[in-house]
C-alpha cells in the first residue's frame, strides 16, 4: 500500500546513515511530499479535498494512501518502518498510548489559539503523559432526539420528560419515555446515569478528578426514586433497563425521547425525524448528562522527522486538520460530526452539527484505562447494565446498589489514572 520512496542509491545511503548513527539531513525528502494514511472512507474523502485544494502548506504536496479497512490501517501502522510509514495517520484515540510508548507517534505543541478551537476533553483523548500527539478530527458520540409529533419543544429538565411520559403514557400508548437506541445500556446510557447525578469518572479542565467520588450514592438514589420509580419502588417504565426494541419503538411513535448514535442518524432522517439533537437534560435546567464523546485524530508520526518533513506535517495538521475551513471541506464529504468548533456552526447536515455541539456541550473522553476496570474490581461496561437491572427490574435498593458501583468506580479511577 505504501509508496516506494528511494532508488537503490537512496536506500544504500540511508542504510549507511543508520549504521553510522548520523541524522539524515532535511534534503532527505527531496520531493517535499507529506504522506497521510487513512481508512476506506476517510482516505477517499481526504484525497478529494486535497485534489480540490492542495496548497495548504507552501512547498509541500499531500499524498493520501487508503487502506481497505480500519483494521488494515492499524495493522499497517503496527508493521510500518522508517522507509514505509506515513507522516500523518488518521486513527483512533486509543492508538495514542501504544504509539507514544513504541515511538511510532510523535508529540506536537499547539498554540493556545489552535487549542481553543476544540475542547480540553478532545485533547485529553489524544494525549499521553501530558503530551499531545495529534489534532482532533471527528467525534464518536450519542445524543438525544425527540419526536416532534409527540413533543412540541425541547425539554429543559429530566423532570419535564418524566412528566410528559406520565401524562401521556395511556392516551398515546407509550411503551417508555426515554430509551437507548444507540450505544447500549453502558456506553450509550452514560448520559442517563450522568443526568441523574452519577458518572463513571468526573472531568474538570480536561483532567480526571480524583478527589471527589464519581457517585454520591444518596443523591443518585434519591433521583432514581424520584424520576424512575413509583411509590412502591417499582419502575414506572419511563427508562427501561434494556435497549431491546428501543429504535423500532421510537420510529413507531411509541417513545417520545431516544438516545441515538451518530453513526445511524440517516435512519431517522429517512423516516422523517428532525435532528433536534441535544444531551439528555439534567435535574436542573441548564445541566446535562455527559455522554462519551471521544474523537478520532490526525496523528503525527515519528517518521515525518526522520524524512525531514516534520515541519510540513505539523503545518498541515494546523492549517488543514485543525482549521475551520479544512474541517468543513472534509466533513462535507465524510458526514461525521466535526470536533472543530467553527465547523460545528457551518452549513453541514443538521445531524453533524447537532452531534458535534452536543459533544462540545456535554462530552467526556472514553478512557479505557479507567472504564475497563482493574484487578479486584469490575469494568464499567459490566457494572452499569447490571445496575439498571438491579434497580429497575429486580427491585433492589438504589442507594445500596449505587454505593457498590461507586466503590468499584473509585478502584478503577485510582488504577487508571496511573496510565494516562
Q: How would you label these PLM feature ranges?
A:
Residues 2-4, 8-21, 25-95, 400, ...:
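Conserved N-terminal structural module of periplasmic/extracytoplasmic solute-binding proteins
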Residues 86-87, 115-149, 287-291, 366-374:
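A structural signal for short loop-to-beta-strand junctions that line the ligand-binding cleft
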Residues 133-137, 142, 162-211, 255:
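Extracytoplasmic/periplasmic solute-binding protein
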Residues 364-420:
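Conserved C-terminal helix/tail region of periplasmic/extracytoplasmic solute-binding proteins
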Residues 130, 270-334:
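Extracytoplasmic/periplasmic substrate-recognition and gating elements
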Residues 331-382, 418-420:
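Long, aromatic- and glycine/proline-rich binding clefts that accommodate carbohydrate-like moieties
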Residues 93-141, 153-154, 158-160, 278:
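Hinge/lid segment of periplasmic solute-binding proteins
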Residues 207-240:
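Glycine-centered hinge/linker elements that transmit conformational signals in sensory
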Amino acid at each position: 500500500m505504501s509508496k516506494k520512496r528511494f532508488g537503490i542509491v537512496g536506500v544504500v545511503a540511508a542504510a549507511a546513515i543508520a549504521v553510522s548513527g548520523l541524522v539524515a539531513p532535511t534534503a532527505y525528502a527531496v520531493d517535499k511530499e507529506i504522506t497521510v494514511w487513512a481508512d476506506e472512507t476517510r482516505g477517499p474523502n481526504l484525497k478529494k479535498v486535497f485534489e480540490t485544494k492542495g496548497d495548504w502548506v507552501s512547498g509541500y504536496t499531500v499524498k493520501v494512501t487508503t487502506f481497505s479497512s480500519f483494521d488494515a490501517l492499524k495493522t499497517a501502522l503496527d508493521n510500518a518502518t522508517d522507509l514505509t510509514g506515513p507522516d500523518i495517520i488518521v486513527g483512533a484515540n486509543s492508538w495514542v498510548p501504544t504509539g507514544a510508548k513504541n515511538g511510532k507517534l510523535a508529540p506536537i505543541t499547539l498554540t493556545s489559539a489552535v487549542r481553543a478551537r476544540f475542547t480540553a476533553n478532545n485533547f485529553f483523548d489524544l494525549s499521553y503523559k501530558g503530551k499531545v500527539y495529534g489534532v482532533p478530527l471527528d467525534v464518536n458520540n450519542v445524543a438525544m432526539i425527540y419526536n416532534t409529533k409527540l413533543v412540541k419543544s425541547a425539554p429543559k429538565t429530566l423532570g419535564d420528560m418524566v412528566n410528559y411520559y406520565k401524562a401521556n403514557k395511556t392516551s398515546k400508548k407509550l411503551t417508555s419515555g426515554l430509551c437507548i437506541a444507540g450505544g447500549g445500556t453502558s456506553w450509550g446510557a452514560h448520559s442517563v446515569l450522568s443526568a441523574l447525578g452519577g458518572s463513571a469518572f468526573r472531568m474538570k479542565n480536561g483532567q480526571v478528578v480524583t478527589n471527589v467520588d464519581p457517585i454520591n450514592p444518596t443523591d443518585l438514589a434519591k433521583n432514581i426514586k424520584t424520576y424512575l420509580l413509583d411509590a412502591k419502588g417499582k419502575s414506572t417504565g419511563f427508562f427501561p433497563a434494556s435497549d431491546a426494541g428501543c429504535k423500532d419503538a421510537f420510529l413507531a411513535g411509541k417513545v417520545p425521547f431516544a438516545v441515538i448514535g451518530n453513526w445511524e442518524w440517516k435512519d431517522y432522517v429517512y423516516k422523517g425525524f428532525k435532528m433536534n439533537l441535544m444531551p439528555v437534560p439534567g435535574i436542573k435546567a441548564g445541566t446535562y448528562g455527559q455522554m462519551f464523546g471521544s474523537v478520532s485524530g490526525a496523528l503525527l508520526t515519528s517518521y515525518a522527522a526522520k524524512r525531514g518533513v516534520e515541519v510540513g506535517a505539523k503545518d498541515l495538521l494546523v492549517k488543514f486538520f485543525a482549521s475551520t475551513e479544512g474541517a468543513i471541506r472534509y466533513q462535507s464529504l465524510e458526514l461525521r460530526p466535526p470536533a472543530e468548533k467553527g465547523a460545528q456552526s457551518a452549513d453541514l447536515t443538521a445531524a453533524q452539527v447537532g452531534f458535534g455541539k452536543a459533544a462540545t456541550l456535554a462530552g467526556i473522553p472514553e478512557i479505557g484505562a479507567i472504564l475497563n476496570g482493574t484487578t479486584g474490581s469490575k469494568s464499567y461496561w459490566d457494572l452499569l447494565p447490571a445496575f439498571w437491572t438491579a434497580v429497575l427490574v429486580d427491585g433492589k435498593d438504589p442507594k445500596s446498589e449505587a454505593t457498590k458501583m461507586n466503590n468499584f468506580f473509585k478502584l478503577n479511577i485510582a488504577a487508571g489514572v496511573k496510565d494516562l
